[in-house]
């Protein structure tokens, strides 16, 4: 453990040193060298400099996009209930719906059959052949340890969805890739991840938030059971939290049914459509900054199910407090029960919040609403 920490600390020092020397050179140029250059010369240089091409310029052919997190035999590039895979899969689906050839890549070309709609998969060998034939390509990954894939990519786009990895065990690899200019552009899955990259690497990282496939995630009012509260198994704390929340809401005079959602994506969608409220029990991988999500509150919104969650990074970008959901004041069962009581104890409030959550999702958080972020990230035309 000490050895691993030493490697991470040395990588962080390396990044800090490179940023310091770059800043020193810039200060030297701005404060010492630039005043020595006559203004007339500087104006001449500005006039001769041609503007860089814009991202909306017309391309002769659409690029082919390859997306992967394939790492090794234990992480082949597809396994059940991997939220990161779902986001990458939905990225490929969005690209294909906009007319691009786009593929997921796993070691053997196979995928675990669990999503409502799987994007086409290629094996590493098929990917090598197709990428060699393609004229214009984009390589995308969310996992800097994906060596079988990234070793075949001269440069790639990095969509960081897991700060607990990027800031810790993956940091030396990430720092080396940044230093060697292997990463064309970085995007964070929320503002916290974006800010990390901007601060540490002084790069213009973008934000590409979760992609929820609203072709499949959509409301069905006929299935709604208003007093049903759904939740996922989020770890060892979950069962005790649910028991305590049930006790407190019952003591407040509410008769709520708490149902654990489980199964493959199509089954989860049906179960989510039945819930009046979804409570996200995820307390994050760090008590300070969480993990940047999770996706489930946004999936709930797509179904018109009111999300209630803890304050881990991400929900504040989805939820207007007490308008289309509630972010509990702290990560305790008491705070979650308090949020549920605030919704169910006021007649008509659940129905109002349900309409608002669906409206906000449709206008601001649908897959299509994310296209401007995605196209900017991958240097693609907006239209």
Labelled PLM ranges:
Residues 232, 321-322, 326-333, 342-347:
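Conserved acidic donor-binding segment of nucleotide-sugar-dependent glycosyltransferases
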Residues 80, 84-93, 195-268:
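Conserved catalytic-core segment of nucleotide-activated headgroup transferases in glycan assembly
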Residues 273-288, 305:
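Acidic donor-binding loop of glycosyltransferase active sites
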Residues 281-297, 312, 316-317:
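Nucleotide-sugar-dependent
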Residues 9-134, 311-315, 327-329:
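N-terminal pre-catalytic "stem/leader" segment of glycosyltransferase-like enzymes
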Residues 47-53, 103-184:
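Extended catalytic core of nucleotide-activated donor transferases of GT-like folds
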Residues 301, 306-309:
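Short hydrophobic beta-strand element within catalytic cores of glycosyltransferases
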Residues 348-381:
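A charged, aromatic-enriched C-terminal amphipathic alpha-helix characteristic of glycosyltransferases
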């Amino acid at each position: 453990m000490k050895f691993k920490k030493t490697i991470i600390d040395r990588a962080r020092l390396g990044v800090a040193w490179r940023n310091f020397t770059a800043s020193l050179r810039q200060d030297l140029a701005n404060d010492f060298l630039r005043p020595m250059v006559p203004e007339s010369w500087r104006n001449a240089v500005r006039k001769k400099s041609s503007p860089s091409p814009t991202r909306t310029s017309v391309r002769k052919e659409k690029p082919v996009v390859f997306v992967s997190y394939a790492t090794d035999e234990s992480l082949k590039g597809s396994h059940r209930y991997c939220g990161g895979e779902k986001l990458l899969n939905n990225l490929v689906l969005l690209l294909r719906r906009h007319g691009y050839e786009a593929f997921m890549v796993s070691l053997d070309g196979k995928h675990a059959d669990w999503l409502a709609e799987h994007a086409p998969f290629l094996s590493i060998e098929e990917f090598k052949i197709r990428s060699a034939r393609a004229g214009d390509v984009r390589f995308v990954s969310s996992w800097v340890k994906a060596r079988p894939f990234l070793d075949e990519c001269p440069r790639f786009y990095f969509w960081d969805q897991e700060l607990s990895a990027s800031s810790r065990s993956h940091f030396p690899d990430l720092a080396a890739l940044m230093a060697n200019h292997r990463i064309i552009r970085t995007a964070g899955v929320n503002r916290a991840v974006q800010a990390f990259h901007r601060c540490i690497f002084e790069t213009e990282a973008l934000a590409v938030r979760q992609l929820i496939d609203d072709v499949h995630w959509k409301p069905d009012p006929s299935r709604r059971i208003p007093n049903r509260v759904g939740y996922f198994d989020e770890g060892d704390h979950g069962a005790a939290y649910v028991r305590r929340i049930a006790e407190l809401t019952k003591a407040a005079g509410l008769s709520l049914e708490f149902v654990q959602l489980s199964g493959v994506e199509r089954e989860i969608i049906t179960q989510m459509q039945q819930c009046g409220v979804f409570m996200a029990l995820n307390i994050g991988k760090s008590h300070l900054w969480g993990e940047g999500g999770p996706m489930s509150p946004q999936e709930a919104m797509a179904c018109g199910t009111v999300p209630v969650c803890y304050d881990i990074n991400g929900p504040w970008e989805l939820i207007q407090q007490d308008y289309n959901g509630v972010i509990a004041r702290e990560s305790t069962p008491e705070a979650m029960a308090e949020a549920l009581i605030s919704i169910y104890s006021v007649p008509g409030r659940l129905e109002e919040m349900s309409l608002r959550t669906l409206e906000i999702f449709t206008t601001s958080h649908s897959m299509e609403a994310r296209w401007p972020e995605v196209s900017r990230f991958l240097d693609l035309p907006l239209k």
